[in-house]
Amino acid sequence: KRKKLKYIQYNDFFKNNKKKYDLVIIVDVLHHVGIESSYKILKKLSKISKNIIVKDHFEHGFFSRQLLRFVDFYANYAYDVNIPKKYYDYSSWKKTIKKSRLKEVKIIESFQQHDGLFNFILNKKHHFVSHLKHVKK
């Protein structure tokens, strides 16, 4: 029997939430929290789920960062979302995982998320998906 998936908006997610989940998926969110403090969100998520799937962005230098900022601004302007000054690079992502006390099961780097013009502007090297797992103490 299939279970129905339930979407829970982030603002409400941690309020009085005592449930455990098989999987939590977080898409293009952590860089808005800030790469220096995003490990705190991952730690919270690891308390309610053994598996976390993260989709986010890698920057590859100054020009790459400006492209990411432009696309973020365009996509989030109407929602008053913080546009970060920095995005993850491979090293900062690994540090975030370590600070979160999670284990990376698999990472998929460089995949196409968008079609057409957005793929031309923000090509596949800017995207990654990481499967993180809660490590028992």
Language-model features: where?
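Glycine-rich phosphate-binding loop signature in dinucleotide/nucleotide-binding domains
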Residues: 17-20
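A short, conserved alpha-helix within the catalytic core of class I
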Residues: 33-48, 54
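Class I SAM-dependent methyltransferase SAM/SAH-binding core
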Residues: 1-14
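Conserved acidic residues
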Residues: 22, 50
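Core SAM-dependent methyltransferase catalytic element
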Residues: 109-137
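Active-site micro-motifs of SAM-dependent methyltransferase domains
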Residues: 14, 31, 59
